[in-house]
Amino acid sequence: MTVNLDWENLGFSYMKLPYRYIAYYRNGQWEEGTLTEDATLHISESSPSLHYGQQAFEGLKAYRTKDGSIQLFRPDKNAERLQRTADRLLMPQVPTEMFVDAVKQVVRANEEYVPPYGTGGTLYIRPLLIGVGDIIGVKPAEEYIFTIFVMPVGNYFKGGLTPTNFIVSDDYDRAAPHGTGAAKVGGNYAASLLPGKIAKDKHFSDVIYLDPATHTKIEEVGSANFFGITKNDEFVTPLSPSILPSITKYSLLYLAEHRLGLKPIEGDVPLADLGKFTEAGACGTAAVISPIGGIQHGDDFHVFYSETEVGPVTRKLYDELTGIQFGDVEAPEGWIVKV
């Protein structure tokens, strides 16, 4: 079957594809999952996921390589992160083998929608874990649904990798010091909508959140992780229990050290130390790397490498990681899973 899509101009939006995966957790165990054409979830109106936010999700991609094969990038790490989130919300873990197999099933079932090599497009994969059933009152569900749907998405940067500017939020926190910041739960994203809108209304790309305890250290950039490059060839990124551990960030930390010869550093990133960075960026699944041109904080605006050009180290990191994902660059052992 040939799919007639404008592959070069795909955006990042929902598209209903023929198949998705669904599995039910009942009576203390996971039942065998299945592929279905039904894109609607049928759940009780009193499901804890609707009322109390007992839900978790993931995001990853499938890539078409030059030889036409399809591969995944570190799906086991997404499985492990979903397991940690499930533990935090008293939900049953989805075993890694079950997770990866389910991802493979749904990608294979919709493989004609994986964008061709060279278009920059990918098949975005959204696993979702929700508590369901007739529960009223604040307590964990007894039944759960694990589902995965997919859609083709385009290159995040249509005109090529481009820096954008961000603004520091002094009025809003992304997460509480001992809250759910390290978990990938919907509530964290719902809370980011208002500050994100305020930033965009001021013509910034998104918000930079500070640590919730002291408001002096950089934590996250919108829904992505922050990194900075110093003149001393250091790759620096924040470390905090309220930051979502990005698979992209940890991949970049490894590549920065082992492919580019940089010194990887995880630790506090004081806002007052922005001047030590010659380049900066945000990283995550959607864009891979979003170069940061400048950061506004109060009346101060700090420019890194350039507001219009991507720094050389950021460019090398982006090319190295995307090269691995699309099969053009040799991957570290265990990073690539063929579908």
Write out the residue ranges for each language-model feature:
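Charged, gly/pro-rich active-site loop segments
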Residues: 96, 106-118
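Extended, Lys/Arg-enriched charged tracts that mediate electrostatic binding to polyanionic substrates
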Residues: 116-130
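Short glycine-rich, low-complexity/disordered patches
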Residues: 113-120, 330-334
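Helix-start/capping segments and mature chain N-termini
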Residues: 1-106, 128, 135-339
